[in-house]
Regions:
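Carbohydrate-active catalytic/glycan-binding domains of CAZyme proteins
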Residues: 1-214
């Protein structure tokens, strides 16, 4: 909500208290922006014109580091840290009772978060990061939305992690991540993706590429 903190007025600020790992989806002619703040909770913003006005709705639930999926006539969200959950939502983006379940738990170490949810071919994919320092990217897959899921580490290279998978109009796959350089900040990092035996592979042999020729 508008406040002195968000407007950086009267000596106030909201650094590290704003949107966390926002999910953006386009479905049936509408853009959906789903996010949570640590203080106010969950919000959904929608529009038919991404450069125009957005309609804001305060949600009953907050979804930490969420990923949104429209799957046929159903709406799902993956969310959480360390223990990831998937919930089915109704048309008002409220949880449907009984359809909010634990699906995966961290395996390599704590810090599992920043998840995105996809249906690609016959698999559901949860694309997640192990945040902190050092950080790396991982993926889970299952043929059932609620699992069981199997996991594969994708890239473990100098803190390149956390982002989304994108398919272009020509069928190419890429991932937009960020390159965490500590005090220097976080730099956008685009990596090529290829699919091998139903798993995405990032960069070259699990290492990020700094330049890439098509």
């Amino acid at each position: 909500e508008a406040s002195d903190g968000y407007n950086l007025e009267n000596g106030q600020n909201r650094y590290s208290r704003g949107q966390w790992a926002t999910a953006l989806q386009y479905h049936d002619g509408k853009f959906y922006l789903l996010f949570t703040t640590l203080d106010e909770g969950g919000y959904l913003l929608t529009t038919t014109d991404i450069e125009g006005e957005w309609e804001k709705k305060k949600l009953n639930d907050g979804f930490y580091d969420c990923g949104l999926l429209f799957d046929n006539d159903k709406i799902y969200v993956v969310y959480g840290i360390n223990q990831l959950r998937i919930a089915e939502l109704d048309a008002d983006f409220n949880k449907i009772p009984g359809n909010d379940k634990d699906v995966v738990k961290w395996s390599f170490r704590e810090g599992l978060e920043g998840s995105r949810l996809y249906k690609i071919g016959e698999y559901y994919y949860i694309y997640s990061t192990y945040g902190g320092w050092p950080a790396f990217q991982t993926v889970f897959r299952s043929k059932d939305i609620y699992g069981p899921y199997e996991e594969k580490k994708l890239i473990d290279d100098d803190n390149i992690h956390q982002g989304a998978l994108v398919e272009t109009q020509t069928g190419e796959w890429w991932t937009m991540l960020f390159y965490d350089k500590g005090a220097y900040g976080r730099f956008p990092n685009l990596q090529p993706v290829k699919w091998v035996d139903g798993w995405p592979e990032i960069g070259e042999n699990g290492k990020g590429v700094t330049t890439y020729r098509k």
